[in-house]
Structure formats: C-alpha cells, structure tokens
Amino acid sequence: MLKLGIFMMPIHPANKNLVDCLEEDRNLVIKADKLNYSEAWMGEHYSSSGEPVPSPFIFNASLISETKQIKFGTGVISLPQQHPAIVAGHAA
C-alpha cells in the first residue's frame, strides 16, 4: 500500500503575522491527517521570519490531540543552536 508523507517547508511572507503562519502550518498537517497521510516532518527554522518554527518538537506536540493517525518527525534540529542535553530531553 502506498503511504504519503509531507515535509513542511514553512515559507511565508516575512511580514506575515507569526500566529497566522503557525496556524496555517498546523491546518495543513491536520488536513494531511484527514487525507490519510502517514507522516508529517517539520524542520527547525531560526534563520528568517518567513520560516517561524524554532521548535519542531513543540510544533508537532501541539498537533497530537488534533490528529488521529499521522506520525510526526523532525526534519532538522540545529545542534549548534542548543545544548545537546536539551535536545535529548525534548526528543525523549
């Protein structure tokens, strides 16, 4: 059986409201779950206001209660930005 997944590349206009950006990204994952996508991946993005996801762990955790079957993954964790023990704690 074919399984579909989505990698979130959350590029938004730099002047767009942060809350609106995150809500748009969350709605996309919720829609993917309803369409029976099997997984959703989100990377960590500190580099620009157009990619407003500093913690894929928190972003993914915020979707657990609103999805039924989709699995979550982190596409990128920038270890130079954080202490490895903090990353390990978030991932546990």
Regions found by a protein language model. Give the residues of each.
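Conserved strand-turn element in the central/C-terminal portion of the radical SAM core barrel
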Residues: G73-Q81
